[in-house]
Amino acid sequence: YLNQRLTMPDDYGRSLLNDIGIEELAHIEMLQTMMMMLMKDATIEEIKAAGLENHYTEHGKDIFPENESGVSFTTDYISSTGDVIANIVEDMAAEQKARKTYDNILRLAKDQEVADPIRFLREREIVHFQRFGEALRLLQEELDSKNYYAFNPNFDCMQNTTR
């Protein structure tokens, strides 16, 4: 979101992407803190029972950004297409996927100290989805009224220099 904000055509979109991008950094901090608290006093047996022996082998009890399969985070997960409509739709999808992940975590969580902050993060993903929906609506209102499919209006303005 912080990368996409620089090419947003309006102040609302730039501010929204900036605010949500910064909030997402705080979400990462919350998740890292929860993981640190859960790992801090874990025994080797508990780490193995949780299926975290590969993580422990590589990182000890340090927090390292990776998915549930142990695949390290990479910027390949960050989408920025150069098309503001495509970016906002992608952002909406990302928020829905995060919300769904939190739904699944809540189904598994037995500890209220885990469930409560996850519930908060889930609620924020819903709000982000709604704000991105508003941004999409505003962008579409600014497009030519004949642009039914809400594609990037700048696409047809680009020169093809290879002809």
Regions found by a protein language model. Give the residues of each.
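Non-heme di-metal
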Residues: 1-163
